[in-house]
């Protein structure tokens, strides 16, 4: 049983306002789960502007953060920062920074096997990988791929908008969701500083806007969250060929909802029994049951996030809590997750955090 007093939570935030968000934060915020199970604030730590999305390497005590802007002078665009964290106190120290190879990097993913990170640059529509050393500092060998294309939504899909990257379970392939191109593009990986080789594309319904992606724990099924249509494409994953095949498209919002449509994040429970996604506008978490035979989804219900504009959310390391980051309410609301039904219920714990965007747990 994990000692709950040694669980850290890092929160990525907006520190500079953008057209879609009014920033209130100063950097990356750290919390520690106390003996009573409640999160207590440690401090905030400086980073690049808008350290929104994070990823962590628990074994090497490393944290990487996007700098989601387009005007860092030394880079001519966005950036990414590398931090070490103290395993005893959770304190962060920024040790390096690097150009993201584009504008508005909105997602970072760690590739531990190759000691490199991958970035999705939303505004410029590109993917970049950057290798790093054991100390977290970046080394030579960055590789950039520029996406080309558009789709039917003239306001949001006038060009490519890479939104996330995800490694497949074998670590052989990288899946890049591009909201502007209506596709999840699959790349094969080659070495720590080698190229990304385009292998296949999953093309979703026009105007869907793929945003985030998650694999089922069995590695055979995958889930593409579409921001603009508020749908999920359930896919079969062929790990030999590196291909995705959609077998179901399901709505995330109630049929009678006529308000804003904008999904944000998706996660499959470690048990594989349930999948969850966040809905901005509706300000909710959608709860699905996962069919044990084919991975398809059945709607179980919706749970209000008790705040405005839920972005990323995180399942606790034990899988018995869900933490929802309400960007425009400056709160993280904690829900109990029923291990028999998958349903959520508010615990009453509300963590104050300015403009929270991304949540990452670290066990020590």
Regions found by a protein language model. Give the residues of each.
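Short glycine/acidic-enriched loop and turn motifs that connect beta-strands
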Residues: 15-19, 69-74, 123-126, 181-183, ...
């Amino acid at each position: 049983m994990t000692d709950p007093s040694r669980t850290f939570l890092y929160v990525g935030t907006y520190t500079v306002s953008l057209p879609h968000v009014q920033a209130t934060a100063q950097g990356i915020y750290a919390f520690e789960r106390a003996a009573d199970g409640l999160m207590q604030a440690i401090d905030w730590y400086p980073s690049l502007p808008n350290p929104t999305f994070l990823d962590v390497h628990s074994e090497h005590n490393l944290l990487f953060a996007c700098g989601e802007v387009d005007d860092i002078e030394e880079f001519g665009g966005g950036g990414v920062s590398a931090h070490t964290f103290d395993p005893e106190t959770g304190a962060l120290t920024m040790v390096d920074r690097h150009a993201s190879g584009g504008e508005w990097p909105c997602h970072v993913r760690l590739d531990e096997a190759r000691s490199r990170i991958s970035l999705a640059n939303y505004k410029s529509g590109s993917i970049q990988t950057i290798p790093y050393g054991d100390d977290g500092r970046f080394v030579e060998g960055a590789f950039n791929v520029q996406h080309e294309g558009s789709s039917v939504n003239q306001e949001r899909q006038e060009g490519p908008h890479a939104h996330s990257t995800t490694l497949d379970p074998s670590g052989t392939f990288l899946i890049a969701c591009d909201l502007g191109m209506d596709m999840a593009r699959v790349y094969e990986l080659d070495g720590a500083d080698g190229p990304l080789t385009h292998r296949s594309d999953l093309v979703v319904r026009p105007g869907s806007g793929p945003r985030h992606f998650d694999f089922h724990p069995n590695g055979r099924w995958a889930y593409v969250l579409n921001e603009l249509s508020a749908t999920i494409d359930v896919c079969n994953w062929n790990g030999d060929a590196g291909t995705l095949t959609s077998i179901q498209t399901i709505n995330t919002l109630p049929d009678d909802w006529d308000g804003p449509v904008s999904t944000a994040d998706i996660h499959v429970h470690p048990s594989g029994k349930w999948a969850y996604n966040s809905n901005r506008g509706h300000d909710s978490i959608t709860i699905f049951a996962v069919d044990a035979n084919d991975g398809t989804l059945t709607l179980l219900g919706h749970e209000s996030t008790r705040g405005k504009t839920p972005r990323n959310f995180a399942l606790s390391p034990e899988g018995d809590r869900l933490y929802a980051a309400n960007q425009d309410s400056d709160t993280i609301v904690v829900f109990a997750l029923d291990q028999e039904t998958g349903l959520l219920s508010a615990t009453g714990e509300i963590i104050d955090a300015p403009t929270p965007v991304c949540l990452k747990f670290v066990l020590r």
